[in-house]
């Protein structure tokens, strides 16, 4: 029974973490398609996706060691 509960908890945590990996509220995915090496930090340590988006920035935590909250591309810079 305890093993099943641990499996369920792991599944829930995995789903929650994957759903917040990239957030583009109010921005297009193209605006947030900034290569990791070109990201300009827009947040602060431990910024949440919601706080980042409220600043008008993109949030993507999939790549360690680079800013997760970063300035979006302007529409003219977007690569379609």
UniProtKB/Swiss-Prot annotation:
Residues 1-21 form the signal peptide. It is found in: Secreted, Extracellular space, Extracellular matrix; Cytoplasm. The keyword Signal applies. GO terms for biological process: maintenance of gastrointestinal epithelium; regulation of glucose metabolic process. One of its GO terms (cellular component) is extracellular region. One of its GO terms (molecular function) is identical protein binding. Expressed in goblet cells of the intestines and colon (at protein level). Expressed by goblet cells of small and large intestinal epithelia and also by the uterus. Also expressed in the hypothalamus where it is detected in paraventricular, periventricular and supraoptic nuclei (at protein level). Gene3D superfamilies: Spasmolytic Protein, domain 1. It holds the Pfam family Trefoil. PROSITE patterns: P_TREFOIL_1, P_TREFOIL_2. Residues 30-73 form the P-type domain. The keyword Disulfide bond applies. Disulfide bonds join 32-58, 42-57, 52-69. Monomer. Homodimer; disulfide-linked. Involved in the maintenance and repair of the intestinal mucosa. Promotes the mobility of epithelial cells in healing processes (motogen). This is Trefoil factor 3. It comes from Homo sapiens. The lineage of its organism: Eukaryota, Metazoa, Chordata, Craniata, Vertebrata.
């Amino acid at each position: 029974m305890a093993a099943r509960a641990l499996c369920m908890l792991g599944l829930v945590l995995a789903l929650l973490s994957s759903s917040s990996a990239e957030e583009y509220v109010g921005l297009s995915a193209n605006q947030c398609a900034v290569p990791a090496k070109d990201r300009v930090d827009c947040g602060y340590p431990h910024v949440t996706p919601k706080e980042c988006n409220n600043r008008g920035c993109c949030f993507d935590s999939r790549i360690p060691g680079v800013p997760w909250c970063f300035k979006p591309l302007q529409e003219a810079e977007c690569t379609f």
